[in-house]
Amino acid sequence: MTAISLKDVRKSFGRYQALKGVSFNVQEGSVTGFVGPNGAGKTTTIKVMAGLVRPDSGEVRLLGRDPFEDVEVMNEVSFVFTRLMYPPTDTVLEYLEDQAAVFGGDVKKAIEEFDLKVHLKKKLSELSSGLAQRVQLAAALLKSPKLIIADEPAANLDPPARNELYERIKELNRKGVTFLISSHVLSELERVIDRVVFISDGRVTFEGPLGEALDRGEEIYLLVDNVEKALSVLSGRDVRKDGAYLVVRVDMAEAISSLEKAGVRVLIARRSSLDEAFKKYTNLGG
Amino acid sequence: MSSALKVFRVVLKERYKSPTLELIVPAMIAGNVMIPAFLIRGGFQPYGLVLSFIPMINVSETAAIALALRNVIFVTGEHVYQGFVSSYLTMPVSRTSFFLMAMVSDVVIPLFTFLAIETVYLDLAGILNPYSSSMLVIFSAGYLFSTGVIYLTTFLLKSPGASVLTSIFLLSAIFVGGGVGEFGLIISKNLNFLPLISWTNPYVIAVAETLLPSRYFGALADALTLGVLIDLILGALLYVITLLNFRRMDL
């Protein structure tokens, strides 16, 4: 079943056309990455799904319902924004209680689960980015949502906080929660998503399983101990340097075998990452 | 409890956190000090009662308007400017319902609190009569018009400072300019145009009517009634325009 369905969604702000016919689906039970450069239309798309920005045309469905017409769908969908959008003079406890007053849920359990006991009297304005995100996620889960849509949830987090966030996402997904996560921290997003939607200049440029996005082009990335020797071994093939890596279009096993036969140690061998796919599908590859 | 009522409880709580009402209610009660003061000086004449209900002189009215101004600009407005409204609009509530909830919390509750306090006060003082009741109606109409102006400027300008300055300037210009115009028309006995501007400052007409009721034979009362009606209609229009603007606002 489809958790999110967008069909030809268009939105302009004055003369600026932010969304030029965005269409994609998010499968129920998936963790889908929503990836694109700044200004590509990620936040506008998420705001459209949240009912905060009304599209000029197109169709939006969350769990099969129109969020603009059937607001009750918000009982089953949670949004996590880059920063906590709630009056900053409220305390953590007030925020959680307000959410529980509307959506139900066990505040005590959420406090325990997210280890918030010592922070309850803090004002929301006093929270660090990581803690604010933890509080937001705790609030988002009070309603036991079927779908969580997160806009750059890891944007302001340090690496440990990002790890913690992604671990929680994996855990919740195992319990059946569907996620759409926009992010630009691609290397870490890659660890958690199973599908990806690329958006560039207000248009979706790729939608599908992560493996499919990464496999296209069949390029492999090799980190070797002797670049010059490796280049001579691989000469005649489609090979180029990308930072410390050699990028080559060849079967991975064959490349490793021929390099090692020539005495070149292969330190890392990997297929293209989400970063490379990002460049490819967002026209940023140069 | 329905989803809308649950959201309303949260919206209400945000505006009336302690000690908001603990400060406002005593201020509204104590603010009636001008009523006995004017009545004593005026020898319990109706115009004494009318004078004591003129905004600025009547502290209770000023407190009600101040509370509404704070609610509209510094709570609802701030939530819109800073994006906090996103959290409320991702609750199971339509924009129209949210706007009505905010309007009731911001504007209607301060008015009802004021009216309840005044009614009890006037009744206990034995002066709940047609004059004082009329002044409550006149104030209520002007209050709805004024808060309508504040709401519209808040949603259009999207800046607390600009909203405060613009709405205060606009309302003061209407109130003072209209009052001077009405005074000129009344003393020159040129009453034909009075109904047209009566909505700007009905208090001038009310004072003149209570001072010299026999001179104008009801002409001022008619203008006053029309002024109250125009205030109510303009207030309703301003709210409808603000709601339509909010419904299509990108947040």
Which residues does each predicted region cover?
Chain A
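Alpha-helix C-terminal capping segments
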Residues: 67-68, 74, 96-104, 109-116, ...
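Conserved catalytic Walker-motif region of ABC-type ATPase nucleotide-binding domains
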Residues: 6-9
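ABC transporter nucleotide-binding domains
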Residues: 11-181, 186-187, 191-192
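Short alpha-helical
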Residues: 68, 87, 105, 187, ...
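Extreme N-terminal starter segment of soluble prokaryotic enzymes
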Residues: 2-3
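Short, charged/small-residue-rich alpha-helical element at the C-terminal edge
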Residues: 218-286
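ABC transporter nucleotide-binding domain
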Residues: 166-249
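Structural motif detector for alpha-helix initiation sites
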Residues: 28, 92, 210, 271-274
